Amino acid sequence: MKAVILAGGQGKRLRPLTNDMPKPLVEVAGKPIIVHQIEWLKKYGIREFIVTVGYLKEKFIDYLGSGRKYGAHISYIVEEEPLGTGGGLKNALSLLDKEEMFYVVNGDVITDIDPTKLIGMLDGSVIGAMATVPLPSPYGIVFSDSRDYIILFQEKPVIRDYWINAGLYLFKPEVFKYLPDRGDLERELFPKLADVRKLKTVKYYDFTIWRSIDTLKDLEEAEKIIFKEKISD
């Protein structure tokens, strides 16, 4: 099975690190985000990668090359102008239309969730599956009793009643009929698939790490988790 890594964005919120480096090549705990992703997916048998590139595209090709040094094969789809994640994925049609199904990963996600759990969702007319994770609160929570005495502090808990897009998807090639020439998956594709009941989710409750690297704070938090895991190992 193949995996597409969506890496064409500019990563503006991660500046100044992305002034001269595309976000997926920014290092987290000693290696680029995209290398974390390749190593993660390889653990589940994925060796064929398609990277959609645009901003500073030559940096990807220079750093990753053919993928041989990672025990993988990497192809590149170049966006000559920004197309968004939906348009970027549509550009990869010629490399994916013969596949039974394929993974798609946002280029700024670091995680260890099991992608194979999505496979069972593509049954019948369903053509897309989305990984979701519990919403992490950006703030600490304060609890009080009936007389307004504070009784407990909980630092940035996970809110399990609400779920967010984890940036990992599995699609059948039929999805290309719904993809825009320009635009994002979140705005242009997913609402369409949801309206016709062709999109399902797997809710991931237990994992060591899931982090979307949008800001310097996200990067710092991801590094803390990764280094903590290395120490515990």
Task: Describe each PLM feature range.
Residues D20-V35:
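Short catalytic helix/loop segments, enriched in acidic residues and glycine
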Residues L25, I141-S144, T201:
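A structural signal for short hydrophobic beta-strand segments in well-ordered beta-sheet cores
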Residues I113-Y139:
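Conserved donor-nucleotide/metal-binding helix-loop-beta segment in metal-dependent transferases, i.e.
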